[in-house]
């Protein structure tokens, strides 16, 4: 006997991302590129370089996952339909008369809708990455987690490499050194879908896809509505770090080291001051002897 919940989640898991959800993903990615300083001028001066940057933003996750699976990073170019669709979005965003696309995108309801639809595609990418990794390495759950994460959030890593080549790279923007909230939540999703695939998580695939997508969309829209980017996994990370590595003890140890470093310097300064204070007394004694 099938229940309405199963029908809903199963129908949701069979939803096609083409074309509407893919359009939303390309639109949000290209608009993020356009909002960079100097991106519009660079598009007019060198359209080919701007187009390549846009393709990296749109297909960065697929490129990185292909490289991890020893496939050609140019494999995404074989999907001509998606390339033409992403190129069309790039063209109308940068070269539309009177900048009508950017003006329309400036309305918050449109931004909420596009951002929510983009998060839906993130779930499909994670699931696709986990499935592709399993086809190459059977039940290799570490590989499945890494490839699923790369497919879902690898675009940020690829665009960081692009910024490095252009000379715009900054250490605080590197996803390897400081992972953003979307990358962390994508990694968490990749772990859950991998465990579900290996039957270590007792939940059906379509139910997990539905629940995880609802969670992503809710968090993203809430962050945009409240304009609060402080939604992080810090409490969970702190708890896990204390359990595994004893972070609190490490902080106490480092603070005690700092105190011990300060003490010799203070003693040294005091001794030097005493020496400087002793010099005038010695000079005064010599001066007194000369007077005698």
Swiss-Prot record:
Disruption phenotype: Mice are neonatal lethal. Mice lacking Tmem38a and Tmem38b show a weak heartbeat at E9.5 followed by loss of cardiomyocyte viability and embryonic lethality around 10.5 dpc. Coiled coil: none annotated. GO terms for cellular component: endoplasmic reticulum membrane. Residues 35-47, 101-103, 159-178, 226-292 are cytoplasmic. Residues 248-292 are annotated as: Disordered. Signal peptide: none annotated. GO terms for molecular function: identical protein binding; potassium channel activity. Widely expressed. Its main location: endoplasmic reticulum. Intracellular monovalent cation channel required for maintenance of rapid intracellular calcium release. Acts as a potassium counter-ion channel that functions in synchronization with calcium release from intracellular stores. Activated by increased cytosolic Ca(2+) levels. Belongs to the TMEM38 family. This is Trimeric intracellular cation channel type B. It comes from Mus musculus.
């Amino acid at each position: 006997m099938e229940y309405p919940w199963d029908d809903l989640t199963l129908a949701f898991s069979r939803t096609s991302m083409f074309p509407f959800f893919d359009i939303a993903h390309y639109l949000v990615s290209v608009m993020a590129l356009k909002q960079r300083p100097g991106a519009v001028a660079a598009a007019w001066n060198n359209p080919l370089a701007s187009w390549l940057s846009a393709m990296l933003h749109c297909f960065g996750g697929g490129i990185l996952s292909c490289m991890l699976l020893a496939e050609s990073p140019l494999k995404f170019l074989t999907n001509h339909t998606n390339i033409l669709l992403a190129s069309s979005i790039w063209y109308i965003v940068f070269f539309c008369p009177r900048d009508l696309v950017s003006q329309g995108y400036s309305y918050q309801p449109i931004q909420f809708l596009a951002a929510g639809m983009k998060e839906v595609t993130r779930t499909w990418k994670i699931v696709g990455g986990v499935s592709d990794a399993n086809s190459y390495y059977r039940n290799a759950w570490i590989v499945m987690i890494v490839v699923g994460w790369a497919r879902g959030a690898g675009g940020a890593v690829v665009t960081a490499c692009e910024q490095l080549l252009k000379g715009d790279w900054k250490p605080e923007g590197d996803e390897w050194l400081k992972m953003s909230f979307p990358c962390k939540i994508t990694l968490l999703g990749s772990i859950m879908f991998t465990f579900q695939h290996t039957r270590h998580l007792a939940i059906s695939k379509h139910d997990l896809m539905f629940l995880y997508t609802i969670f992503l969309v809710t968090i993203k829209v809430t962050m945009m509505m409240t304009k609060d980017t402080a939604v992080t996994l810090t409490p969970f990370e702190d708890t896990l770090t204390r359990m595994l590595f004893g972070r609190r003890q490490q902080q106490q140890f480092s603070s005690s080291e700092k105190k011990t470093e300060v003490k010799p310097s203070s003693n040294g300064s005091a001794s030097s001051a005493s020496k400087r204070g002793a010099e005038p007394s010695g000079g005064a004694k010599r001066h007194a002897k000369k007077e005698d």
